[in-house]
Amino acid sequence: MAKRKTLWRGLSALFAFVFTLSCVAGTILEGYKATIDTNLGTQSEKFVSENTADDPLYDKFTPSAEVLNADGTGNSHALIQKAIDLGHKQAVEGAVLLKNENNTLPLASGSNVTLLGIRSHISLLGSSFGVKAKGPYISLEQALSQNKTDFHNTIAYTLNTNYKTGEVTRALSLSEWNGDEFEFEGAGFNVNPTMVDVYTKLNETYQHSENETPFANYDPQEPSLAEVKATNPDYEASFAQYGDAAIVVISRPTAESKDYLPGSVAEGTGASEPLELTTNERDVIETAKKASDKVIVLINTANAVEIGDLKNDPDIDAILWIGLPGCYGMLGVADILCGRVSPSGAMSDIYATYNLS
C-alpha cells in the first residue's frame, strides 16, 4: 500500500512539472512563432477566406461622386474642401467658452479688432510629436478677416528632432503646393495690419512653428513689449482705429509622451511653473486692456494653462478655450467670435487653474 502511495505521489509531481513546463513552453513558442516558422520552414497559422468574385466577403469602398473626377479618379480640390469643412466643424463643436461678461461675445460684424501675442500670428495647430498639423492651413487672421485663400503663405511648419544628436530643425511640413484657391466664410472683421506686420517680423527671429513640443525649462518665448516697440515704435497708435476688441492668444505646446514637470520653467520668464503666465504674456494682456474696452483671451493649448487670474480679472471680458484646432479649425473659432454659431464644447474634467493643485 505504501509503495502505491509513493507511486501516485511521484506521478502527480511529474504531471504537475510537465504541465507547468508545457504552459511556459507554449507561451514562449507562441510569442516567437514567427521566428520559429522562419527558421524551421513551418506554418503556424493560415488565413482562409471565402471571398470570391461572385460573392465578395467585403464590399469595395467607393468614394462619393462629389469627390471624384469624371474618370473616377480622386478630385484633390474637392477632398481638401471636405477636410476644410470637417476641421471647421470640429473646432465649432470642441471650443469651450469659459467666460463671457458684459455681452462681449459675439462681436458685431465689421468690428475692427487687434490681435495681440505672437501666437495670434503663429498659432499652435498640432504637435511636433504625435498628431501633427501638416500642409496648408487657414490662420486666425484669415479666418477673421478674409473669405478665400490659395495657401501661398500658410503652409504649416513643424519641428523635427534628431534623437541621436538632440538637434531640432524647423521645416515646412509640405514641400510643394499646387496653388488652388479655396473660398470660405470668414467672420467679416477688420484686423489691425500693424500688429500683424510686427509679429511677422518678430517671428523671423523667434522662428515659432504651428507644431511644437514641450521641453525642459520651458519658455513660451513671447516677445517683450520692448521688442514690439523696437519693431514698430508707433504700434500703439494703431489701437484707436482697431479698438472694438483686443484678442490675445496664449499657447502651450503639447506632445505625446511629453509632460510639463513642476518647476520646469526657464529663468527670467517671471513664472514659477511652465503653465503659469509669464511676465511678457501678462504685459501683452495689459496692452490689450489699453487697446480696447473688450478683451478676449483665446487659450490655444490642450493643457490647463493657469488662468485663475484672468477668470477673476474684471477687465478680461471673455475666455475661449480652442485647444489645438488643426489646419482649418480657426474657421470655427471665427464663427464663435462673430456669433454665427454658439460654442457647444465642454471640458472632460474640472479645469485646474493652478498647476500644482
Region spans (language model):
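C-terminal non-catalytic regions of proteins with extracellular/luminal or membrane-system context
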Residues: 1-357
